[in-house]
Amino acid sequence: MLCLPGGIVIRPHRRRWEPLSRCVIALAALAIFGLEQALAADSTGVELPGYCKASGEVAGSLKCVGSDTMNNLVALWAEGFKKFYPSVREGIEGKGSASAPPALAEGTCTFGPMSRDWKPSEIDAFKSRHGYPPTVVPVAIDMLVVFVHKDNPLQGLSLEQVDAIFSKNRTGGAVADIRTWGDLGLEGEWKTKPISLYGRNATSGTYGYFKEFALFKGDFKPTVKEQPGSSAVVQAVASDRYGIGYSGFGYLTANVRAVPLAATSEAEPTPPEAEAAYAGDYPLARFLYLSVNHRPGTELDPLRREFLRYVLSREGQADVAKDGYLPVTAPVADQALVAAGVADR
């Protein structure tokens, strides 16, 4: 989700990035550009300027606390950033997106990587301490993917079916629970085999996003085997012929398959491909964020300013692509930097 001035929220859902009427965080990115138009302009990041080293001193401790999904990506950014500023010390703690808001509010981290939106209660806690909301900067695009074992012949799923597989509530409208592969139409050895469920725990932003958009805010079945990280989910599915799980697209391996998804039972399932995400056709595309404590009307200190400039530069977005995610584009990056108090590149 991306929140714009005036109460407009844009989020990936149901085959397009829909404007909603709930304002959570006043971020100016994309205030001028529609998301689909801005992203479609450039899916490679080549329009972004290269990073230019700052003329003044940039030093200190760069500590990031938050999303496990973004752990490797943040490490790539830190590695590239230190090539320009070797004296910078970095520390990365991937405890889950839920750990970012309190760490940022309490001042124990520099940035809070998150793979989900801030909850209203988290924003209120931050505002009660600082008097203004956190700034949330979109830094990459991810596709949340449903994985099955590489030998599984399943051709596609609707979100209604995903809900009936993972949720005990079936808020998405399915009339019956889905417990076996035969319930999805598979034959032969698969027909009677129970579906083994793998997922994340409640501290994970991926868990929260999947719960909201794939489970229609329903509750997970108690049979979901919670894993400590995104890669652990994929490894579990790779080791379980009858398993299914969800994780970010960047964790795809040769031992699992990404299942094409459809927003509705009437729609054709769409593979998790870049073109589909940029066009708004893949139903579980989402922004990844860096949250920062930025007092409105001020500029960030050199360390935070330059790290954001690096992340949203050609080099930083090349790291995004290297880690299996999709880059944001120049219009998105430029507006996000302005919103975060970075006056120029």
List PLM regions with ranges.
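N-terminal secretory signal peptides that target proteins for export/translocation
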Residues: M1-P19
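Bacterial N-terminal signal peptides
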Residues: R22-E36
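Flexible loop/hinge segments at secondary-structure junctions
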Residues: A40-R345
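Generic short amphipathic/hydrophobic targeting helices enriched at N-termini
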Residues: L4-G6, L20-S21, A28, A54
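N-terminal compositionally biased, intrinsically disordered segments and leader/signal-like regions
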Residues: V9-R11, F33, G45
